[in-house]
């Protein structure tokens, strides 16, 4: 009896598979011309399994044994469980380690405060190197006959001269401030209240010191003429142009 049932079940399974395949092929032909809303109704009627086989060719039997990677909850409100198929990360953080941050000792508070005077004294040799470089450029300029190379050397020499003037100007300002601070410090020691100069007053003192230096070198008149021309050109830019009236 059991053998007969098993034989009958074995006989039925191939025919069922064939009927399913025939039904799928038949559905494929018909579904290509059906609107989406009707397809959705059809999916509700025949079930998602046969619908997916017909439309997308997805074999649901192949994917039944593969669990989802997302966490699942038991129906009895148990704890979440992870699938054994989930890939383990390559680098697992067992112990949280504090991220190392780069540290520049030049700008770190642990290295102390910046001493400008000490810095300039320590790197005073850089100015000597600049002087030697300027001399070598001037020598090269005298020897060179190539027009393009001479132009490049002239441009480089102008930049060097401009940088040198800027350094000297900054140095003169530092010296002026230093003298004012020393004078004020001496007066405070004698009992005077501390007095701090405004920026405008400090600028006037720096300008007076600059005029004094230029006068000693005989360049004051040239500097004043150049400054007047520069001021006049600035004023000219703000003057409105004269309108031409057609006669």
From Swiss-Prot:
Ranges for region Disordered: 1-29, 62-89, 136-188, 218-247
Cellular component per GO, a single term: 90S preribosome
Biased composition annotated in UniProt, kind: Basic residues: 218-240
One annotated GO biological process: maturation of SSU-rRNA from tricistronic rRNA transcript (SSU-rRNA, 5.8S rRNA, LSU-rRNA)
Pfam families attached to this UniProt entry: RRP36 (PF06102)
Comp. bias intervals (Basic and acidic residues): 136-153, 164-174
Annotated keywords: Nucleus, Ribosome biogenesis, rRNA processing
Record's subcellular location: Nucleus, Nucleolus
Disulfide bonding pattern of the chain: none
Predominant location: nucleus
Biased composition (Acidic residues): 8-23
Job of this protein: Involved in the early processing steps of the pre-rRNA in the maturation pathway leading to the 18S rRNA.
Family: Belongs to the RRP36 family.
Name by which UniProt lists this protein: Ribosomal RNA processing protein 36 homolog
């Amino acid at each position: 009896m059991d053998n007969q049932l098993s034989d009958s079940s074995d006989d039925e399974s191939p025919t069922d598979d064939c009927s399913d395949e025939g039904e799928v092929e038949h559905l494929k032909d018909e579904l290509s011309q059906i609107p989406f809303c009707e397809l959705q109704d059809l999916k509700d009627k025949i079930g998602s399994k046969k619908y997916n086989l017909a439309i997308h060719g997805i074999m649901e039997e192949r994917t039944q044994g593969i669990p989802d990677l997302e966490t699942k909850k038991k129906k009895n409100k148990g704890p979440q469980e992870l699938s054994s198929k989930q890939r383990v990360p390559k680098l697992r953080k067992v112990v949280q380690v504090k991220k190392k941050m780069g540290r520049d000792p030049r700008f770190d508070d642990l290295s102390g405060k910046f001493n400008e005077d000490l810095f300039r004294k320590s790197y005073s040799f850089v100015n000597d190197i600049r002087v030697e470089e300027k001399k070598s450029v001037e020598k090269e300029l005298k020897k060179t006959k190539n027009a393009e190379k001479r132009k490049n050397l002239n441009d480089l020499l102008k930049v060097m001269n401009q940088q040198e003037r800027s350094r000297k100007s900054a140095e003169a300002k530092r010296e002026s401030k230093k003298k004012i601070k020393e004078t004020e410090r001496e007066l405070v020691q004698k009992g005077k209240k501390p007095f701090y100069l405004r920026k405008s007053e400090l600028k006037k003192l720096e300008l007076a010191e600059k005029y004094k230096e230029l006068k000693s070198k005989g360049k004051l008149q040239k500097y004043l003429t150049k400054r007047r021309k520069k001021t006049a050109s600035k004023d000219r830019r703000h003057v409105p142009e004269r309108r031409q009236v057609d006669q």
